[in-house]
UniProtKB/Swiss-Prot annotation:
Pfam families per UniProt: Ribosomal_L4
Entry keyword set: Ribonucleoprotein, Ribosomal protein, RNA-binding, rRNA-binding
Molecular function per GO: rRNA binding; structural constituent of ribosome
One example of a Gene Ontology biological process annotation: translation
Family affiliation: Belongs to the universal ribosomal protein uL4 family.
Record InterPro entries: Ribosomal_uL4, Ribosomal_uL4-like, Ribosomal_uL4_dom_sf
Record-given protein name: Large ribosomal subunit protein uL4
GO cellular component, one term: ribonucleoprotein complex
PANTHER family: 50S RIBOSOMAL PROTEIN L4, LARGE RIBOSOMAL SUBUNIT PROTEIN UL4M
Gene name for this UniProt entry: rplD
Quaternary structure and partners: Part of the 50S ribosomal subunit.
Length: 206
């Protein structure tokens, strides 16, 4: 069973925390993580790109000049791809990029991502993060105490003051635990997570 240090938001160690093997100590499945990230990125695509082929460009029905005797290269239509305003070869058309991933694979992927962070000592567990008023410098101070630059902060219920304090810090993203996803966990160098959020993850994914 993995064990990690438990810190307060001042960066001081206040104890240890045992993590569930079934969530934070699984065999890392890189294939599952790759498939889920691929699907997440594909599902973000709008798929609205479009261009006209030579068949769809208006005009150009007549041959621009006669075949022989002009000294110029022969041309059949001003709609040909080599012409300015001509059609596009293999023109992109609107399409749906959506991919569906089984729930079981999503579960395996998120557990693998969290386990990889624990294995590499890139997960910091904090007992709680609370602020009386929005203060960005307090969150920056906390992250500096953990030597965390590009960081994902995960809370059980993101308090408004904490959210407002963290949202404008470059390279930092804060999300409630219900919005956790593989892409964000892998994208950021470090994960700073509250103790309550850990319990919630173990409850859902164990």
């Amino acid at each position: 069973m993995p064990k990690v240090d438990l810190f307060n938001q001042n960066g001081e160690k206040v104890g240890d925390l045992q993590l569930a093997d079934s969530v934070f100590g699984v065999e890392v499945n890189t294939y599952a993580m790759h498939q889920v990230v691929k699907a997440l990125l594909a599902n973000k695509r709008q798929g609205t790109q479009s261009a006209k082929t030579r068949a769809e460009v208006s005009g150009g029905g007549i041959k621009p000049w006669r075949q022989k005797g002009t000294g110029r290269a022969r041309q059949g239509s001003i709609r040909a791809p080599q012409w300015i305003h001509g059609g596009v070869v293999f023109a992109p058309k609107p399409r749906d990029y959506r991919m569906s991933i089984p729930k079981s694979m999503k579960k395996v992927a998120i557990k693998s991502a969290l386990t990889s962070k624990v294995n590499e000592n890139l997960m910091v567990v904090v007992d709680e993060i609370k602020l009386e008023t929005p203060k960005t410098k307090e969150v920056v101070k906390m992250l500096n105490s953990f030597n965390a630059k590009k960081t994902l902060i995960i809370t059980n219920n993101a308090e408004e003051n904490v959210y407002k304090s963290a949202r404008n810090i470059e390279g930092v993203q804060i999300i409630p635990v219900n919005n956790i996803n593989v892409y964000d966990v892998l994208k950021y160098d470090k994960v700073v997570i509250t103790k309550d959020a850990v319990s919630k993850i173990e409850e859902v994914y164990a």
